C-alpha cells in the first residue's frame, strides 16, 4: 500500500459503565496508538450499545442533548494532536461549525443528518443552508436496522430506495392542477413533490394549522423536534407557491369546483376506540389523541391499553402522570 496509505482507528474511549474503559484509560490507549506511529486519525465515540437505553446514550434520540460527547472527542484531540473525527447527534450545520471552531474536531460525522438530506454539503456550498432537510432524531433508521430491515428515514422516503425513488425530483412534461385534502405529513409531501414537478397545487385542511398527527406527538416536549418534518415541508411548499386553505372542511363538490386533474386524499387515520363489545364503559373511554391534544385531562386511576407498542401509548402515559393520575399500562407486547 505504500507509506502514504491513510489508516485511522475508530473506537470507544469511554464505555460509561462500571468495569469498562474509563475516559482516562481511553486517552491513554489513544496516546499509545499515536506513539506507535501507525495511525493517522482517530474516530472517537463514547458508550456502548448492548441495551436500548445504552444505545440512546451513545446515539441520542429526539429530546436528548445535541452533540453530548464532544467533550471526550476534544480531549482525545488535545491529548494526541492527531486529527479527530466524531459522530453523535451533530444534526445541524451550526453545531458542526461549533465543533470545528471550538477545537473539538477536525472532521464532523453527520450520519443521520445525511440520511435525512444527502445534499447537505452541496447546499452549504451554494449558500442554501435554510433548505437543508433537518434530522429530527426519530431514529426510525436505527429502529429498522435493529429489527433486521433496511435503514430508511422517516423524513426522507427516498433514502434507502434510491433505485426506485430519486432524491432529485424531475419536472413533468405537462403541468396539471392538483388538489390535496389533508395537510399532515403525507399531504404536505404530496404537495411538495407535485409542486416540484411543476404542477399547480392546492391543499385543503380542516384544522387551523398543518401537521396532523405529528402536531399531536410534538406536543410532548421530548418529541417537539418532530415538527421539523412539517415545518420543512411547509417552507418548501410556500417557496413553490402552493395554495393552502386551513379551517376548511371540504366535500366532493368543493374539490370538483377547482376542476382538478388529480385529487389526493390524505386525511389520515382515525383513533381506534372500539375496545369493548358493549357500550357499558364507553363514557370512560378516551383515545391517546384526546390526552395528547389536551382535550381530556386525565385524573384518578388511568388504564392505558396499548396495542401498537409505539410512541402514542407511552406519551399518553407520560402526560397522565404529569397531570397527577395513577397510570397502569396493558399491552400484548412481551416487553
Where would I find each of the regions flagged by the language model?
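Flavin-dependent oxidoreductase catalytic cores
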Residues: 1-181, 185, 189-196, 200-201, ...
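Short connector loops at secondary-structure junctions
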Residues: 9, 45-50, 205-220, 228-235, ...
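Redox-cofactor binding/interface segments in oxidoreductases and associated redox assembly factors
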Residues: 44, 110, 264-266, 304
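Short acidic, glycine/proline-rich loop/turn micro-motifs
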Residues: 53-58, 213-218, 276-278
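Short, contiguous acidic/charged loop-to-helix segments that flank catalytic cores in large enzymes
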Residues: 57-65, 168-170, 175-176, 216-228, ...
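Short, charged, surface-exposed secondary-structure boundary motifs
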Residues: 117-121, 213, 274-275, 295-297
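Rossmann-like dinucleotide/flavin-binding elements
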Residues: 175-206, 245-259, 266-335
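N-terminal Rossmann-like dinucleotide/flavin-binding domain of flavoprotein oxidoreductases
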Residues: 212-258
